[in-house]
Each structure stands twice: as C-alpha cells, then as structure tokens.
Amino acid sequence: MKKRDFPVSQIRRYLEPGPIVLVSSAFEGKTNIMTLGWQTVMEFTPSLVGCMIAGGNHSFEMIRRSRECVINLPTTKLTDQVVGIGNCSGATVDKFAKFGLAAAPATHVQAPLIAECAANFECRLVDDAMVRKYNFFIFEVVKAHVAASPKYPQTLHYTGDGVFMVAGKTISRRAKFRPEML
C-alpha cells in the first residue's frame, strides 16, 4: 500500500472516534503485534496519543523497555487478522508470519510498520507516569504515513461481544467550524 507523508498534528482524523488499531513493537531483535481497542488523542501539537495496554500482554514489556511502537490503522479488509492477532500471544507466535502481514521499516523508530494498514503512526513513549498504576502509556507521534486514498478509510470499531461497527460514511460541516477548531 503506497503511503505519503502526513502532518502528525492532523492524525486525529484517523484516530477519532477510536478505531481498532494494531500496535507493532520491537525489542532485542524480536517483533510483535497486538490488537488495541482503546486509544485516545490527548494533544494535537505535539501529537500525543494515550493507550492502555494490559500488563499481562506480551507487548506491554516490549513497549515499556523499547519506549516506542507503531500504531497501525487496519481497515475492514484485515478484520480476520485483527481478531486472530488479539487471540494469540507474541511470546509464542510470530504474528507477522502467522497472519501474512508485511513488516516495513519505520523511519524514526525500530518497531516495524504494518504495510497492509491504511495508516502508520511512529511513536515514542514520552510519559510513563501512569503505566505502573493504570497501564496507561502516553506516546508522541513522531512520523505519520497514510495511504493516498481513500481519504476516510473503512475502519473497525469494536462494540464488544465479537461485533464490530464499520466507519466510512462522512458528514461534513467544515464551513460551520471556526478555523482554530478544525
């Protein structure tokens, strides 16, 4: 999937309202992917994203130690991979190989991009004050890569009970916004 550079200050278009993401990590020569159902944009400049990663998750230690990751945005085409990745542990499985995903090199972090995803956000851990108590990591997006089209990809939104909603239809009210609120 061909990507173009994208301003990291504008990534909220891809992350709100909370799509399922695949978080890739790397540490000591090993890579992993986890499915993440909850993240939040916390600041626009610099672009900060908060993620809750369960302490028992294999990715937790990899990300805590490496202090970086890539937040990858899958579309509906990757629904089965999203579920499969969430149902196994990277401690025993190479998830890139098992789910037929291509690890592409990132430019600012060691963690790989997932080539098949519509967007990839390279992140560095900038605040771990809430990790010990809440497993809450705050990342700064240091590089953003997005597919040239579609502008608004069909993303997955987990509703629980094995059911996803699909984003895709857009309603524009751009003219009604104050410029600084866009």
Describe each region flagged by the PLM.
Residues 1-182:
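Basic, polyanion-binding surface patches
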